[in-house]
Amino acid sequence: VTSGEIWFKGQRIDDLPCYKRALEGMFLSFQNPIEIPGITLSSFIRSALEQRGIKLRLMQYKKELKNTMDILNIDESYADRDLNKGFSGGEKKKAEVLQMLMLNPSFAILDETDSGLDVDATKTVSLGIEEYRKKNDGSLFIITHNTKILQALSVDYTHIMVDGSLVKTSDASLIDDINANGFAQYEKDQ
């Protein structure tokens, strides 16, 4: 934040450390997810759930994890692999969407989740995002430079930011305008 304040659920959070924001129900999917050797994807998600006070019996957890992995077409063996270690770019993005679906945050920020994805992975990630929207009444903030992923989603609002400033807000029709005319018209307004 370069200026102003960030409020979430009636609480100012711009001074809160990231882990406390996560405990409040925020989720951030990174553009370039890091590899964490020694911690499996499954244990990472289960630990994050427990930190949020969600304690599932092991068999119930495994069943929910498997069902969610099936939605995202992720092989079950990935649950026992080190977090993001040796994952392709698309597999890392799917793993992040898996975490979002399992943690069910009230506010999720997806930072270029579509970056580097092939057509099939983009469809799978879009399906995961729509699944989040169906089962959660929270908010989703998608940062992207490519409108392809947005075309597969139900978009309520579209915002354009240039150099950290919000320059345009509209409904989903703004996506069509961007596809037809690009971003340049908004950049020169700055």
Annotate each predicted stretch with a short phrase.
Residues 112-113, 120:
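Walker B catalytic motif
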Residues 100-101:
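ABC ATPase C-loop
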Residues 157, 161, 165-188:
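Conserved beta-strand-loop-alpha-helix hinge in the C-terminal portion
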Residues 5-21, 84:
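ABC ATPase NBD Q-loop/coupling interface
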